[in-house]
C-alpha cells in the first residue's frame, strides 16, 4: 500500500535499543574503571556503541540517498532535531562554566582564597592553547569553504576544504593530548584540575565526534552522495563543528586565559 504523505515512517530498528544498552555499559564501565581499575565493561560498551553508530548511519544513508525517503518535510524535521540537539549541548557546557565560575569568582579558604588555587601551576594560555585556537578557527574557515563549494557545485574545492577540516580536527586532538600529557596538574588537583579537565575533556570528545562526522561526510562527498540542494548531512556536521568552535573560544577565554 502506497502512503499518500511526504513523511518517512521508519522501519523497526534495533539500533535505539543497542545504543541505550551501550550507553548503560559505558557509564557503568566508567564507574567500575574508576573504582576497580577494570575497563572490560567500558571497552565492551564502546565496541557496541561503534557497531550501533556504523549500522545506524548505514541505514540512514540508505534511506536518504538510495531510497529517497528524506523529502522536504523530513529534512525540515531533521533540521529542527539538530537545532534542539545543539541547544541541549549548549546547556551541557553551560553547567561546566557555571561550576568553574562558582569556584573561581569566590575562592574558598580550602583553595587558599586565590585562583588558581595555592600550589597549582596553570598552563600558559599563549602556547599550545593559543595554537589550538588558531587551528580550530582555521577549521571553521575550511568547513565554510567546503559548504560554499558544494552550493556552487565546485566538487573539487568541496573535497579539498572538507579534507583540510578533518586534518585540522585530528591535529587539534593531537595537540590537546600533548597538552594533557605535559600538564603540571591532574584532574585530582583541587576543583581547578577537575573543572579544567572535565570541561576541556568533554570539548575534546566533541571534537572527536565532529571529526568523525565530517570524515563520514567526506566519504559521502567523494562518492557523489551530496548535491547543491540536498546535503543536510553535511550541513548538520558543519553546524556541529561551528558549535565546537564557539565553545572552544569560551573555554580558551574563560578557563585557559582568565582562569590562569
Swiss-Prot record:
S-S bridge residues: none
Listed GO biological process terms: mitochondrial electron transport, cytochrome c to oxygen
PROSITE patterns linked: COX3
Localization in the cell: Mitochondrion inner membrane
Keyword Glycosyltransferase: no
Catalytic activity line of the entry: 4 Fe(II)-[cytochrome c] + O2 + 8 H(+)(in) = 4 Fe(III)-[cytochrome c] + 2 H2O + 4 H(+)(out)
Annotated Gene3D superfamilies: 1.10.287.70, Cytochrome c oxidase, subunit III, four-helix bundle
Keywords: Membrane, Mitochondrion, Mitochondrion inner membrane, Translocase, Transmembrane, Transmembrane helix
A Pfam family per the record: COX3
EC number(s) from the headed UniProt entry: 7.1.1.9
TM region(s), chain numbering: 14-34, 41-61, 81-101, 126-146, 158-178, 196-216, 238-258
Gene Ontology molecular function, alphabetical: cytochrome-c oxidase activity
Enzyme class: translocase
Membrane topology qualifier: Multi-pass membrane protein
CC per GO annotation: mitochondrial inner membrane
Quaternary structure and interacting proteins, as annotated: Component of the cytochrome c oxidase (complex IV, CIV), a multisubunit enzyme composed of a catalytic core of 3 subunits and several supernumerary subunits. The complex exists as a monomer or a dimer and forms supercomplexes (SCs) in the inner mitochondrial membrane with ubiquinol-cytochrome c oxidoreductase (cytochrome b-c1 complex, complex III, CIII).
Protein's job: Component of the cytochrome c oxidase, the last enzyme in the mitochondrial electron transport chain which drives oxidative phosphorylation. The respiratory chain contains 3 multisubunit complexes succinate dehydrogenase (complex II, CII), ubiquinol-cytochrome c oxidoreductase (cytochrome b-c1 complex, complex III, CIII) and cytochrome c oxidase (complex IV, CIV), that cooperate to transfer electrons derived from NADH and succinate to molecular oxygen, creating an electrochemical gradient over the inner membrane that drives transmembrane transport and the ATP synthase.
Family from the record: Belongs to the cytochrome c oxidase subunit 3 family.
Protein name in UniProt: Cytochrome c oxidase subunit 3
Gene: COIII
